[in-house]
Design a protein with these regions (language model features):
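Catalytic core of pol beta-like nucleotidyltransferases
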Residues: 1-26, 35-40, 50-110
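A contiguous binding-surface segment within folded domains or other stable secondary-structure elements
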Residues: 32
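Short beta-strand->loop micro-motif that forms the acidic, two-metal-ion catalytic signature
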Residues: 45-49
Length: 110
């Protein structure tokens, strides 16, 4: 199997696990994998947009644990829908480049 296909299968599996367990509003892949330049040693940068009760950091850690063993390093960042709206045009936030250069992997039907 080609490396690109294998990477895509792993990313698809990460999305499936996140959607199944956490019901996010949206998942965006950004960084080198979204640009198509990431290798197996590059982490998959995932912006997970979801409602959170409590700590977003704790939610990101829980998601990271749910993705254990997928076979690719990853960096999970959890933001709320309100933060996306508030910071979508603010340069210097992680939301800004993720929305502009990222690839939407999942979006919950309205």
């Amino acid at each position: 199997m080609e490396d690109g296909q294998r990477r895509q299968q792993i990313i698809d599996e990460m999305v499936r696990r996140i959607v199944e367990r956490y019901d996010p509003e949206k998942i965006i892949l950004f960084g080198s994998h979204a640009r198509g330049t990431g290798g197996f040693d590059s982490d998959a940068d995932l912006l997970v947009v979801m409602r959170v009760t409590g700590s977003k950091r704790r939610a990101a850690i829980e998601i990271d644990l749910a993705l254990a063993g997928v076979g690719m390093p990853k960096d999970v960042i959890v933001v709320t829908p309100e933060e996306v709206e508030r910071y979508r045009d603010t340069v210097g936030t992680i939301i800004y480049p993720a929305l502009r250069e990222g690839k939407v992997l999942y979006e919950r039907a309205a």
